[in-house]
């Protein structure tokens, strides 16, 4: 009898104790009834039916539905109805401000001929009659002729109004005579680090490449801060609809970085941005004087250099001549002494360095320069952006000095139609080697390079794994021996990008203590049929626990 009484008393005590603990903790929001992929280990993508408790923007607990809901109370319970939850997508290489500004210019993406380019310009000019006429997105490789356009037709349509339209990669542009005159480029001239093409009679063709293009762009009036603010607010909404919660802006001036910071502080901008400062003078000096810094939403600890141009405009620096232009290899943009001095200063001041390298000559040079500064294995996380054509003999250098290759998979599926002509049958096997690049260091951050490519990370995932364009071409995939498995592609869009951004302690996986940056999808990318990947719907995007996009009501 005494034992029974003791048992009853103990049971009452335990019950009372449990009642005291029931919903004893406060959360701001609880996301529940979800299939969660935490991405919290390099090879741990096992789905779990979990609930996530969030307070002050950070994840405070993750666990079984009953455990979280019995422990935490919250005024906001979000039932995700067994939808799939990943860490918020991270774009490891983009041009966010550049993309934003293209939204108010002539969109030339997808044009199938020069005539279509001219037609879009005429249409846009009717409703935008004043000032410079600018646009971006044409690609002569998508046209039947595959040759550069000239200013002849532009001059006929716009004899007085200045026109400058950039190629999709941003490394070349076409200008009419009015624009060339304003820039003082009436006659063909030599550019170090660039090229100005001519017609048969020796007069300018209107095509300016790399440094020559930059020279003309400097005379086009810059949008003011108010225009940039409006553009970025619109652009951010588009990114949230795609499930992006963080984006790298690869090459900004100090003033624009400060503008982004002010927008974060005012609440006009929510998306996390890794702002790589442009490594050109005088911006480089200003960046060194300020030093590396960060806030909860903005990281300004990286410097971006350009070592060469693009493959499409034949500006990528190759060791051997282009297969379709036998006298041409292009050139390295940067003086070796100046570049090495900048690397030494960046290393001393604690900056991350990222360098644009497309051609095998550029990749070889920068890998060697990095080695000279870094020495061996380290945690500086210096990056090579694009790593598009890499000699097999150079691959070992990535791992030896912990150099991170940062790639954009849709480049492979956009370039595959003509890249073989540029590089030849043998050398094309050295290009778009995503599998080999991943194996050099164990991670491979993925990005879009927007506005060069589409902003949609689902297209990044599809191109990385299926290696086809959006029409399903080629049927067997492009160079499938270099395709990523789906788990690696997901990690490349989440935790691996966070590692490359020096922000993996804060974002990139769903873990206690990290920011609650999430994306909710209607299907699992790891198991979806290949033909269904691009049909995936983003249902919700969450930044620091707050829903920034909700497909059910169009909420931003």
Over which residues does each language-model region extend?
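Non-cysteine beta-strand/loop elements that form the S-adenosyl-L-methionine
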Residues: 95, 297-315, 402-413
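His/Asp/Glu-enriched, well-ordered alpha-helical/loop segment
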Residues: 344-354, 361-382, 386-387, 392-396, ...
